[in-house]
Amino acid sequence: MSNSAVSYKPIVNIENIVATVTLEQSLDLYAMERSIPNIEYDPDQFPGLIFRLEQPKVTALIFKSGKMVVTGAKSTEELIKAVKRIIKTLKKYGIKIMGKPKIQIQNIVASANLHVNVNLDKAAFLLENNMYEPEQFPGLIFRMDDPRVVLLIFSSGKMVITGAKREDEVSKAVKRIFDKLAELDCVKPIEEEEELEL
């Protein structure tokens, strides 16, 4: 079957967004620990305060410099909602917040399923910027330049994408790698493989 018969029908899921938030003011973490419930702060163990939200389910590490690291959001919208909820909670418990928080996405981790089988040996030989050592790790590691992401590609057609800064970069990367693998004749429909095993 030619690679043109392999259809593009991926399922892509954002698994985690890591972002930094800058408040441009210093924070009294001891005062926050005393007044806000369900906060963890042990400066002997870690310099930041740990703030967990249930809805959306994210964790924020808050530092006295006014910087935060927020993890766990599954979309940009969820990230913004979480930051707003954190700020609202801080204000509710008497922490004065001046100005608007500046949010910068540092990394988006996503998973994808191409619904094809990938010939990793062939892909490793034909693709540039890759590393494939199946005796060490079962996936092919591919470094893409545009968008600038790293993809872990498995023979099952499943993959992990890291390094994106925007959600649309994830979709673009998945489409580009699929097109490249199809062009190099490294993908086969799953049904074809299953028929060969019978």
Curated annotation (Swiss-Prot):
Keywords, ordered alphabetically: DNA-binding, Repeat, Transcription, Transcription regulation
Species name: Saccharolobus shibatae (strain ATCC 51178 / DSM 5389 / JCM 8931 / NBRC 15437 / B12) (Sulfolobus shibatae)
InterPro entries: TBP, TBP_archaea, TBP_CS, TBP_dom_sf
Disruption phenotype: In vitro depletion studies show decreased transcription. Restoration of transcription requires the TATA-like A box upstream of the promoter.
Cited function: General factor that plays a role in the activation of archaeal genes transcribed by RNA polymerase. Binds specifically to the TATA box promoter element which lies close to the position of transcription initiation.
UniProt xrefs under SUPFAM superfamilies: TATA-box binding protein-like (SSF55945)
Additional information: Probably starts with an ATC start codon.
Transmembrane segments: none
HAMAP family (UniProt xref): TATA_bind_prot_arch
Cross-referenced PROSITE patterns: TFIID
Gene Ontology molecular function: DNA binding; DNA-binding transcription factor activity
Sequence repeat locations: 14-90, 105-181
Family, similarity comment: Belongs to the TBP family.
Protein name: TATA-box-binding protein
Lineage of producing organism: Archaea, Thermoproteota, Thermoprotei, Sulfolobales, Sulfolobaceae
Top-level taxonomic group: Archaea
GO biological-process terms attached to the record: DNA-templated transcription initiation
